[in-house]
């Protein structure tokens, strides 16, 4: 039997913290939802600005569906609202602006799971609130939806507030770099240029798909004719989500590639008088290259 409503929100928070203590699963939901709506593999898109109004509006449904699917262990379908969590009806609302949630009148008296994510800053927020007139603005829009009032915002209990999610590397690149990468005619050339340009940055698979615009796009990275082979003579290695690659990234104090992510870096042999982070591959000590270092063919990196 449901407890007192004030306890409901602490139950929701506990439920999520018990299955996703660091928020990594929620973070992945937002990355996947953006990638899904961009559909970069088929469209080459990588930004909310490139979507039509209808597509933008659809992002909320995609987020809701993906949260429901990812958290099947704690969320059921609601009878009147989107979700049922701990025997309570919960409406899931996404807004691309920080406090823009549109609350339908039928949600009054129920709880809300309020979501916001910004792909430009790679930060997301998820919080819970009980919807009643005291937290909503008076008067709604044409279809009777209301927004959370400025005074009502303090009643949101945040599960995550401006937590990072896997970055959209492409949005973080210089516009000239973006244009140069996308102007190349073949998927292979675009991928090679991406890894040349966006070094030491985690590159999610969605960006690889967007740039390659080909089926089995992850295969385009590998040795045997992929980007790893193409960039080896330039001294650049591409690390993936293999443990051996994560260890290399860690040893060189680089960002660690997450699931499905890649990261490129140019290497140079450690000189006898140098004292800096290095990694040993096939008996040679390698460090991150500096701009002033000449190009030396990169080692072939192990996968185990």
What are these regions (language model features)?
Residues 1-81, 94-304:
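Nucleic-acid endonuclease domains
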Residues 83-84, 88-93:
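Extended, Lys/Arg-enriched charged tracts that mediate electrostatic binding to polyanionic substrates
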């Amino acid at each position: 039997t449901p407890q007192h409503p004030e306890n409901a929100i602490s139950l929701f928070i506990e439920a999520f913290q018990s299955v996703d203590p660091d928020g990594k699963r929620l973070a992945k939901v937002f990355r996947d939802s953006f990638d899904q709506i961009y559909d970069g593999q088929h469209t080459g898109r990588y930004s909310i600005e490139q979507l039509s109004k209808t597509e933008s509006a659809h992002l909320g449904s995609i987020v809701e569906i993906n949260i429901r699917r990812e958290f099947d262990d704690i969320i059921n379908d609601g009878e009147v609202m989107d979700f049922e969590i701990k025997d309570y009806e919960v409406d899931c609302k996404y807004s691309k602006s920080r406090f823009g949630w549109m609350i339908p009148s039928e949600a009054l008296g129920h709880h809300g799971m309020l979501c916001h994510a910004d792909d430009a800053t790679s930060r997301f927020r998820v919080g819970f609130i009980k919807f009643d007139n005291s937290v909503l603005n008076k008067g709604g829009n044409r279809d009777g939806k209301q927004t959370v009032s400025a005074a009502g915002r303090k009643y949101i209990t945040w599960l995550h507030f401006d937590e990072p999610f896997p970055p959209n590397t492409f949005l973080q690149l210089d516009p000239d770099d973006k244009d140069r990468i996308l102007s190349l005619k073949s998927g292979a050339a675009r991928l090679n240029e991406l890894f040349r340009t966006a070094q030491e940055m985690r590159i999610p698979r969605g960006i690889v798909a967007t740039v390659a615009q080909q089926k089995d796009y992850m295969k385009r990275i590998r040795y045997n004719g992929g980007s790893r082979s193409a960039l080896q003579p330039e001294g650049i290695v591409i690390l993936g989500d293999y443990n051996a690659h994560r260890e290399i990234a860690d040893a060189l104090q680089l960002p660690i590639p997450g699931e499905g992510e890649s990261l490129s870096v140019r290497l140079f042999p450690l000189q006898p008088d140098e004292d800096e982070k290095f990694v040993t591959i096939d008996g040679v000590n390698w460090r991150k290259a500096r701009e002033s270092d000449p190009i030396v063919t990169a080692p072939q990196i192990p996968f185990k």
